[in-house]
């Protein structure tokens, strides 16, 4: 089973994350940030990754540390659960609609971290959640999962819909890219014979 648990404690946050890449999208999320919990719930359910996220952070300051540190821990958990990445599909691309919004997400599970994030929001906040934290989370996740990730919102007007299309797009791209391709017969999908080097 491709699964991992990560515990990460700093002076700012105390986080425990568990993932099962071969799950059915079972979710247990509690970060203390309602909108962020909603986005992580979407990520788990649409990727079919079983996901537990427990986070206690310095929310009296703002949501930045908790959001970023959850991205770090989730990325580390996915990377650990992947092991040597043998048999994975590796690449995926999705166009994700959310009402008037359309976002393209392209992923390469390469072991080489990179984020290209071309998404803007029409306002600074969704409820109490700073929209700039969407990019912060995606960056933390991509860097620690070791994936190349391109996120581009082609058009959209509603900030909630834009954020949701980004998270759902990532979910469906992960679902495809992390899937085991039986034609790979357990081989690492790289001419180098390994990923990440």
UniProtKB/Swiss-Prot annotation:
Subcellular location(s) per record: Cytoplasm
Listed CDD domains: IGPD
Keyword presence, Amino-acid biosynthesis: yes
Keywords noted in UniProt: Amino-acid biosynthesis, Cytoplasm, Histidine biosynthesis, Lyase
Pathway(s) per entry: Amino-acid biosynthesis; L-histidine biosynthesis; L-histidine from 5-phospho-alpha-D-ribose 1-diphosphate: step 6/9
Reaction(s) catalysed by this chain's protein: D-erythro-1-(imidazol-4-yl)glycerol 3-phosphate = 3-(imidazol-4-yl)-2-oxopropyl phosphate + H2O
GO cellular component: cytoplasm
Superkingdom of source: Bacteria
GO biological process: L-histidine biosynthetic process
One GO molecular-function entry: imidazoleglycerol-phosphate dehydratase activity
Pfam families xref list: IGPD
Catalytic activity, EC: 4.2.1.19
InterPro entries in the record: IGPD_sf, ImidazoleglycerolP_deHydtase, ImidazoleglycerP_deHydtase_CS, Ribosomal_Su5_D2-typ_SF
NCBIfam families, per database record: PRK00951.1-5, PRK00951.2-1, PRK00951.2-4
Family of this protein: Belongs to the imidazoleglycerol-phosphate dehydratase family.
HAMAP family (UniProt xref): HisB
Protein name: Imidazoleglycerol-phosphate dehydratase
UniProt organism field: Bradyrhizobium sp. (strain BTAi1 / ATCC BAA-1182)
């Amino acid at each position: 089973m491709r699964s991992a648990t990560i515990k990460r404690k700093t002076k700012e946050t105390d986080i425990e994350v568990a993932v099962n890449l071969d799950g059915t999208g079972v979710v247990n999320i509690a970060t203390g940030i309602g909108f962020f919990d909603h986005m992580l719930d979407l990520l788990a359910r649409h990727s079919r990754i079983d996901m537990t996220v427990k986070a206690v952070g310095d929310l009296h300051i703002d949501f930045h540390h908790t959001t970023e540190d959850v991205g770090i821990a989730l990325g580390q958990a996915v990377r650990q659960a992947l092991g040597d990445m043998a048999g994975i599909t590796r690449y995926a691309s999705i166009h994700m609609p959310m009402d008037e919004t359309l976002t393209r997400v392209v992923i390469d599970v390469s072991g080489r971290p990179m984020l290209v994030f071309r998404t803007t929001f029409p306002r600074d906040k969704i409820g109490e959640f700073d929209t700039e934290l969407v990019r912060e989370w995606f960056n933390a996740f991509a860097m620690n999962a070791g994936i190349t990730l391109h996120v581009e919102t082609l058009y959209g007007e509603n900030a909630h819909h834009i954020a949701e299309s980004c998270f759902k797009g990532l979910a469906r791209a992960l679902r495809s890219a992390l899937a085991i391709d039986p034609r790979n017969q357990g081989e690492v999908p790289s001419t180098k014979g390994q990923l990440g080097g």
